[in-house]
Amino acid sequence: MYPGIHNFSEIGKLNKVLLHRPGKELEALTPATLERLLFDDVPYLKIAQEEHDNFARVLRENGVEVVYYVDEVAKAIADPARQIQLVNDFLNISKIHAKGLRASMTSYLLNMPPKQMVAELIAGIKRSEVATKEATSLMDLVEDDYPFVSDPMPNLYFTRDPGACVGN
């Protein structure tokens, strides 16, 4: 097998697959958050995990190498410089610009091992987890009823939705 991605058929033999095991991000789904998080129903985490585990087992039994999104991203950010870059990119994409909150989130995330950091980013970061100690700007003082500073990513367990590859 050659390194990299070489996908020339969507109906040929599957050799390797990237999956995400449903986690805490599904617990963020409530009737109030369904529309915002692009879901139609609130899945039951334990059942979703059991179904996922059975699916992954069947894939392995059929010779498919199963790799997990969290593990692969954690490997990619093993270098502390890459962790800093990921956190900065994540905060920018999430439009988190309030200085106090940004500093709190940066400290919160960079004090985790890479795998835990990735899992937390996917689960969504609650305001209560990164309360700013001191307001450094007007933005830090703005109240919001939404419990998350960054949205959870429940759609990630449909791993083909955020990305697909054709060719190499």
Language model segments and positions:
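The feature marks the mature, well-folded catalytic cores of soluble enzymes
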Residues: M1-N168
